[in-house]
């Protein structure tokens, strides 16, 4: 039987189940330019409305993996574990856990992207380090993974190229918010990345893509199933993003804070999430070791320094600092009971730390430092946050975005746990 895009669209439009052959054909034909953009847009909208069965979704994800190369990481001499975060405000966990897990005997290959809107991108953060580069050849990537044990690089076009085309189309057709499509987008790249195991960190709350636990849990279960079906050991942690993670939000500010954790210090909340993620990553590849001592004794810091140097960076070079700062103060005395992650992330973006469009440049020094954290007692007029920017008008925009981010009350409230659930 000859397959056509119209037949595939009609089947899903009417609530039918696509065959593996139909799924493989339509994604291969779309990637090869034989299915028109408007036809794929129609199919994506049908998927949003009708969903995909577990079998369909497994076939869809497999076809996305098959659209490109699958990395061979078998020559590293170590068990290989990858990590993915759904993104949040102040989420610099990858900067800590990649060298930390590598210091304990695993190999950590991390292909990362750039930030858009209020959430930062790992590449943007690392590019605040003088000389650091993320564009590595396949040979450079693999050599560093073997020699150092950890590498964070820019994702190229070779892995799951169908996903890159589909995501661009979803972005302009209102078909981004679909759990099957989100799950297949993430997992196709992770499966193609070639790791033995993957730890997923799905953020939940005001500053996250998934605002509620039920949706996050559904996404987590879907991704774990896709990874397992593909032979990749997969576990997901649901972690809170109601408040920013750590105190620094912005590229250079987050690198500095990650280095504090690697020195054995840093904010308690960031340290807690990093250790929880690292424990799961190690367990996935059969390494039964507590990661905390590797932060205290400098082993993780040593791998960080080697990782940065291997990619042209100088770990001891001063990070960029903002030309202008402004302190935001408390209007009343009391306990900090809420810090709105979305408002803080938006403030950092407007200060210059993020971008509205993919082609925008970022200011590596811009961002927000939270001087008062959840549960802290503050006096009226005491500092809550410091805004960092390159231009005065940026400070005004950041100040406006941050207005109302802090709730201060007479009595403290119990803080919610940072690690909400484990799936897998």
Describe the predicted segments one by one:
Residues 111, 145, 153-155, 186, ...:
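Short beta-strand segments
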Residues 146-195:
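Phosphate/diphosphate-binding glycine-rich loops and adjacent basic-rich segments that engage nucleotide
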Residues 1-90, 306-307, 419, 424:
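Acidic, glycine/proline-rich low-complexity segments that act as flexible tails and inter-domain linkers
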Residues 44-48, 125, 163-172, 201-210, ...:
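Active-site-proximal beta-alpha loop/turn segments in soluble metabolic enzymes
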Residues 79-102, 106-118:
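Glycine/serine-rich anion-binding loops at beta->alpha junctions
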Residues 7, 12, 17-19, 30, ...:
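Well-ordered secondary-structure scaffolds
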Residues 49, 95-109, 189-194, 229-230, ...:
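Alpha-helix C-terminal capping segments
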Residues 125-151, 221-227, 231:
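A glycine-rich helix N-cap at a beta->alpha junction
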